[in-house]
């Protein structure tokens, strides 16, 4: 049967692992159980990776605690993305945003 000239685009997925050593620290990689592009020192500090989820990135506009464009770029360029815990200041801003308040309102 002749080819119809339709190209399937490769969907972008990431596999997210939780650190066994550091709370709220996550490692995103392109393929399940493939840490070949992750530096050895990073893996030592990360501990035993614990599978959190497999996530399609195509069609997604945002992630909860990471910039999706930075994640995609890091996966493409270096093969991994490391998500560190948010700082206390970031947590406050996020909470206030959810509550519909502005940071300036906290001083009233």
UniProtKB/Swiss-Prot annotation:
Alphabetical list of InterPro entries matching this protein: YcgL-like_sf (IPR038068), YcgL_dom (IPR027354)
Pfam family, any one: YcgL
Domain of life: Bacteria
Gene3D superfamilies (alphabetical): YcgL domain (3.10.510.20)
Bilayer-crossing regions: none
YcgL domain boundaries: 12-96
HAMAP family xrefs: UPF0745 (MF_01866)
Protein's name according to its UniProt entry: Protein YcgL
Organism, scientific name: Shigella dysenteriae serotype 1 (strain Sd197)
């Amino acid at each position: 049967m002749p080819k119809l000239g339709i190209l399937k685009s490769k969907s972008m997925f990431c596999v997210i692992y939780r650190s066994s050593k550091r709370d709220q620290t996550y490692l995103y990689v392109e393929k399940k159980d493939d840490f070949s592009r992750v530096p050895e020192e990073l893996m030592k500090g990360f501990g035993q990776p614990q599978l959190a989820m497999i996530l399609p990135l195509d069609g997604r506009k945002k992630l909860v605690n990471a910039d999706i464009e930075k994640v995609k770029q890091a996966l493409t360029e270096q093969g991994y993305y490391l998500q560190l815990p948010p700082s206390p200041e970031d947590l406050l801003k996020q909470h206030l945003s959810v509550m519909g308040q502005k940071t300036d309102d906290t001083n009233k």
